[in-house]
Amino acid sequence: MIIEKDNQLDEFIEKNLNLDCFIIPILSDVNRHPLENSLCAVYIKIVDGEEGLLCFNHGETLRLSLEKLLTLDRLGRKFVRDKKQLNHIVKLKNVVDVNLQYYMSKNESLEWEELSTNTHDYFYRVMWKMKNTNRIIPILKHFELCREQVKVLEKYYQLPIHEQYNDEIINNLSFIESSGLRKDDGIVYSEYNLYTSTGRPSNRFGGINFAALNKKDESRKPYRSRFEDGILIEFDYDAYHLRLIGHILDYKFPKGSVHEHMREFYGDVTYEESKNTSFQYLYGRIPQQIIDTNPFFSRVNKYITEIWGEFKREDFVKSNIYKKTIYKKNLSAMNRNKLFNYMIQLLETENNMKVMTQLIPFLKDKQSKLILYSYDSFLFDFKLTDGLDFLKGVKQILEQGGVFPTKSSRGLNYHEMEDITEKL
């Protein structure tokens, strides 16, 4: 059923009040970020029921008003392939990300991009320079493709739902993406991909790998504040992985530098040598002598032995914060150190998400924006009128009562940053 008039949509909603459904948005341009895009159409199928294609901007149909999207909240649960994408189009309640459900069970993404029609392939190949191609692809071809796509959602929508990942983490990543980053004279948008083998999100869009902007060349230089009275502020966690592991193992690092503390156990070494040695032991093999003489790595070794034993015995382990299940069946060529590295990256990710859940409400009434999160750092586009109290508030939330100290830096662009830790 093609739905192109508001009263048709009203009738569809009334017939299916509170019923669960599948939703597949069709954006006008397949190559542009959802935040730089417009809505072409939305496919809806009631679970075990009827279907409809809602037309918002297509050359063959009349147009529904975009405000009518909010009436979809009168339906029940809404199963989608990409909740984060939908968040950028419209915020609806009771949305379940089926790709996330599948990933939590299989540790990989749904096979989705492979689904197409000959017509879609032709238009995308021949008219690759044209914008908003989906508006001219025959509407019935969109219907045909959506009918194939919904079969994938129907196959997996009954898998278990991890509510904290589905709601908290996806919404946090949506929030950061919505801020964008000023690059040269425009705003560019990042796209976080949560569905990686380790659980640590990647972040790339439009040929830019935002998670790996090089500090040494000038890759970061085009990025600057969008505000006339603004600067970039970055907070970096100090010795983050060591402190994360220390926290879950109840190892109390003294105030000051972790690497200076660890030097006490390594003999006559420099600060940099101490740092490199600690990371070598953390991510590789811990020598028996270190296990016997270093209380931190003694606990780390015991923890690695425990989770490896649990992994072999139970065929899974759970992450430390959000209790994500890591299944043995989904990981090949696993060993004890590799498993520990997975757990560290997952611990890092989940702790960052936990912090973001506290940070985002603090940012809601501020003009400054959180624009990038990269493993152990958070980058803000800071409007000076938000004041020093804003930066101190951010620092307090990030450091979680002093458990995870940060260093801070500022710059007119992301390449030329100067340390301001002592000023905060």
Predicted segment positions?
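Conserved DEDDh/DEDDy metal-dependent 3′-5′ exonuclease domain
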Residues: 2-10, 16-152
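C-terminal polymerase-core module
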Residues: 181-182, 285-292, 299-343, 381, ...
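Generic structural signal for residues in well-ordered beta-strands
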Residues: 92-95, 370, 406-408
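Helical catalytic core of nucleic-acid polymerases
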Residues: 87-157, 161-179, 214-336
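A glycine-rich phosphate-binding loop feature that marks nucleotide/adenosyl-phosphate handling sites
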Residues: 99, 165-169, 185, 193, ...
